[in-house]
Amino acid sequence: MSRPDGISGDRYNVKETEARWQQAWEAKRCFEAEIAPGKPKYYVLEMFPYPSGRIHMGHVRNYTLGDVVARYKRAKGFNVLHPMGWDAFGLPAENAAIQNNVHPAKWTRENIAAMREQLKSMGLSYDWRREVATCEPEYYRHEQKMFLDFLKAGLVYRKESWVNWDPVENTVLANEQVIDGRGWRSGALVEKRLLSQWFLKITAYAQDLLDSLATLERWPERVRLMQENWIGRSEGARLMFDLDGRSDRLEIFTTRPDTLFGAKFVAIAANHPLAAELAAGNPALAEFVAECNRMGTSEAAIETAEKKGFDTGLRAVHPFDSTWTLPIYVANFVLMDYGSGAIFGCPAHDQRDLDFANKYGLGWTQVVEPASDGQAVLAAIAKGEAYTGDGVAVNSQFLDGLAVDEAKAEAIRRIEEMGRGERTINYRLRDWGVSRQRYWGCPIPVIHCEACGTVPVPAEQLPVVLPEDVSFDKPGNPLDHHPTWKHVDCPCCGKPARRETDTFDTFFESSWYFARYTSPDRTDVAFDRVAADYWMSVDQYIGGIEHAVLHLLYSRFFTRALKDCGYLNVKEPFAGLLTQGMICHETYKSEDGAWLFPTEVVPGADGKLVHAETGAPVTGGRSEKMSKSKKNVVDPAGIIDGYGADTARLFMLSDSPPERDLDWTEAGIDGAWRYVNRLWRMVATAELPPAGAPMPELSPEAAKIRRLLHKTIAQVGEDLERFHFNKAVARIREMTNGLGELPAGDSGAAWVLREGLEATARLIGPMMPHLAEEMWLALGGSGLLAEAAWPEADPALLVEDSVTVAVQVNGKLRATIELPKDVDAALAEQTALAQPQVISAMSGKPARKVVVVPNRIVNVVV
């Protein structure tokens, strides 16, 4: 027996080792994927990053998870596509240009180069040949062509619309980008503005997007529910209210036509055409409308604002009773882009309507009575709460006595019979406004001609490339200020015309990048059809849940549109989805309330936290998501430089399931580092038989550890299939603890130790790939471990040879014992009666009867 030859020295040189194996993988081109029709494919993808210049711990976790999956699937025999790229357009580059006097393109490309090296230092198994950057004309020329094809297909249109305007970023935000009335990036209070915008017709796919959620069985239920709620299908009626003293009508959508007899008012949006008409002759109303327009257009902004209304003096005629009129208010809580921009209010059965009615003294009428408690509505309203539950219609003429669903159906039938409306379906989902008033984005390929109108840029003139000679010394869009770029001849009539100066929302680029990876070298087409048909859909997508109704929904729509325009043959982009949790760290504040970096805090002599330089007391706060604003961040580069990529990867996998938040702790990273070194020492110091030596007779202890080894192989494979990475790590640790307990000087134990260390190297390969390669080399493994197959467990060793048997005294559990499977009943009885707990429970009395149920129970009757 001898020690392995592949390891020298008395400590693990992590920097040299990791760099060496990264070079070896690159030289061997281990991770370059090609179409292989006879091999099962597996496409694993993590959401690509914005190139800010430095990776953060969230990146480390996200990309580690994806890399474990990619390496494991390769070992299982799959043809794995695992690419990486850059979501490279966006406002931060423009902000950097303003602050640092550097061009966005230069800033972005330098950041990409820096982050590429950081990602490579993690040992990630990417096919770097397929790298894309969305800011390059070679990429966005294809999305300009897609836009023109969508335009031909009727999926694009332009209209004036009220938009969410971010006054800090000077651009339009989609509703999904407005959070609690503020811009999702700047945090500025969002305003309403009327602008001419380009829209993608996502609503054309609303029902299919909703129905197909049921097919996404490998998506988290939470994400599917979020998309279902965002699409927001509601069945109801479109009602036509006559306007008292006028010949026109007001259209109202409602999901509760059964409550019409409880109506007390009508409310219209501040940007409703009727509101604009009435405000033209009413200065007070005009001021109220202007106040409403200073709010954001999203539901979040409206829900958080105080509910206000303005009585226009106009009245609407009740559709079931021409003698009954309702006051019409302009209200700040009515959305113009939901339904028809007008509602009727039934205060007794809608909380918002009740609050509004109470504020303006409009009263209420109960029209639904709970079957179980006739006083429930009165009791609720007395507490300021509307009753929104089921029941039967009351005070509703021909609807009285009908259950709510029956009353809805009957109300709609009468409305249709009278010609005052119809049954309809409405969606909360709005068409996607993709126009952005900024420079660093993909130019929209359209020309505006006074003679010809809106003209698509001819395909042969694509791409429309951003000008490089721009300045950022004025607010707003530099393309608007450019002296020459926007001036162009009309491709139809040849007269002077103007380019569209808006650029695409950056979610446009991320809505199709995953398909571009299948053939990024094709310059003539966005996707090679053979490659796209082979690789798509993405088998496993990994990213944050914050993208549930932004990127993920847009990508589902975009893929459908591409399919309908002949680009792809799939309509769902991501077959499986894993949403990882956040990385959290304790927060720290100085005496004056300023946030402190973790590196600025140390334990004092008394164990309490103090400032590292001044010694001043520091207050430790709760663990929160790592963020620059609270300074509770840890630089991955420092961790990788000090501990190595494998240690960082192991920590990311060890302590929490991937979908949960992970608390970063120094103790945790130190523990991971100790385990890395422990594995290295186990191999470096092991006295092992030659590779391939026949198995000698094993002692019971060695046989027990070998059985644990093979169970671990089987269980770790199952854990990785289910993304239970923390469980896999725990099982490997338990198994290597067992290997460490094998007795020295025992040939059978040494043989099991070699088998165990070889299997350990292969099991940790997806998680700690550099250490795994080093162990594999030292143990005499053939070739690169990155190309080796996953270990297989011996089925015979997975069969339990012992069972846990419960021992009862007079039917009460007193002990459990380990017995050989199918043991003789006499031995089972003898072992049970010898247990101290059983002897105590028998209190010196003889056993009158002992019942043995094989492999399950021994029951002693006294």
Curated annotation (Swiss-Prot):
Coiled coil: none annotated. Its EC number is 6.1.1.4. It catalyses: tRNA(Leu) + L-leucine + ATP = L-leucyl-tRNA(Leu) + AMP + diphosphate. GO terms for biological process: leucyl-tRNA aminoacylation. A motif ('HIGH' region) lies at residues 49-59. InterPro entries: aa-tRNA-synth_I_CS (IPR001412), aa-tRNA-synth_Ia (IPR002300), Leu-tRNA-ligase (IPR002302), Leu_tRNA-synth_edit (IPR025709), M/V/L/I-tRNA-synth_anticd-bd (IPR013155), Methionyl/Leucyl_tRNA_Synth (IPR015413), Rossmann-like_a/b/a_fold (IPR014729), tRNAsynth_Ia_anticodon-bd (IPR009080). GO terms for cellular component: cytosol. A motif ('KMSKS' region) lies at residues 625-629. Belongs to the class-I aminoacyl-tRNA synthetase family. This is Leucine--tRNA ligase.
